[in-house]
Amino acid sequence: YKRQEIGSAAAMAAPALVHLRGGTPSMMAHACAMAVKNLLGLVCDPVGGLVEVPCVKRNVIGAMDALSAAQMALAGIESRVPPDQVLDAMAEVGRSLPPSLRETGKGGLAATPFGMAYAPKEG
């Protein structure tokens, strides 16, 4: 699911950061799980049909999520929900979201008065 780009990126970055800091494979798995749980259910509602608003700012949240999850895992904190079950839940949540929130530009922020009137600048 394309709308999971931010969560998927955080889920890959968190264990990579743990690895770079000398963490164990178990810590890496828990970092991945915690990063995914923090962003589970994030919708894709691009204003104007582009990934500029609000996606660029959401990428910052994803980066901080990865850093936070890595730090927690390195500190010995583990996900209470097993990592493989977290990923299964991510897929289920993605399938459960209505089509209007699946990168169609028809729901969420894209459906606000501003979102419907927004015309991206050609450049």
Residue positions per predicted region:
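Functionally critical mobile loop/hinge segments
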Residues: 6, 10-123
